[in-house]
């Protein structure tokens, strides 16, 4: 009887050890910079995207959750918007922020679009991109800084999706932000260089490229 109990105990131990040694693959569902944001709002790795049959619209470049900000991160639109002006006339307060540390591009873009005293050609162009609740907008200086920090990560993915890579050299690398210049809000706003990370204050009636971004929402 004792020997039978010993054999049973040994068999149970062997089963438990085998279970411990078994490897179970758990799918990695974490969204990371370089993942692809699709038109339906899902974010996929490139391998998943290739198998999905979905349409890509942007590449994820930031996934940090920050207090006081909406959404679950940011994705950069695959394509540039043709050069357009911040405003079609000077001397008008458009209600956008001059805080270069604020992640407020979405609010700024709406303020530009909603101003009645002057039009914002770049804001109007960005509003035309809105699809399925994934609302594109003009990034603030702070959001462009986040994009600049990972531009070499997202550029290869943008290219593979048929988009426009962010310029990394000193030529044709300037983009409008939605942040105005403090103390000169009615006349100037900031350009941002994806080649160097530099900023340049610029009259708002000048036409420059825009690279919209999207807030990811679950």
How should these model regions be labeled?
Residues 76, 138-139:
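Short hydrophobic beta-strand that contains or immediately precedes a catalytic carboxylate
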Residues 1-18:
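Sec-dependent bacterial lipoprotein signal peptides
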Residues 20-132, 204-218:
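Short, compositionally biased
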Residues 195-203:
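Active-site rim elements
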Residues 78-81, 192-196:
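Secondary-structure transition/turn motif
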Residues 10, 69, 168-171, 185, ...:
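A generic structural signal for short, non-catalytic loop/turn and secondary-structure boundary residues
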Residues 15-18, 36, 159:
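Secreted/extracellular small peptides and ectodomain modules produced from precursors
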């Amino acid at each position: 009887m004792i020997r039978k109990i010993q054999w049973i105990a040994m068999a149970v131990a062997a089963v438990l050890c085998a279970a411990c040694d078994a490897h179970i693959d758990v799918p990695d569902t974490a969204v990371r910079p370089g993942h692809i944001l699709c038109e339906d709002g899902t974010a996929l790795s490139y391998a998943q995207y290739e198998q999905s049959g979905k349409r890509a619209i942007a590449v994820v470049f930031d996934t940090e959750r920050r207090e006081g900000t909406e959404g679950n991160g940011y994705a950069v639109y695959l394509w540039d918007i043709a050069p357009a002006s911040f405003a079609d006339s000077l001397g008008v307060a458009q209600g956008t922020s001059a805080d270069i540390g604020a992640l407020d591009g979405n609010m700024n873009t709406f303020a530009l679009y909603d101003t009645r005293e002057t039009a914002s050609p770049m804001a109007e162009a960005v509003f035309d991109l809105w699809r399925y609740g994934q609302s594109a907008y003009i990034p603030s200086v702070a959001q462009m800084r986040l994009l600049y920090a990972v531009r070499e990560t997202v550029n290869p993915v943008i290219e593979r999706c048929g988009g426009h890579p962010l310029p990394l050299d000193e030529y044709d690398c300037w983009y409008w932000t939605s942040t105005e210049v403090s103390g000169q809000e009615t006349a100037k706003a900031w350009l941002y260089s994806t080649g160097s990370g530099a900023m340049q204050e610029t009259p708002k009636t000048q036409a420059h490229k825009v690279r919209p971004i999207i807030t990811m929402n679950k």
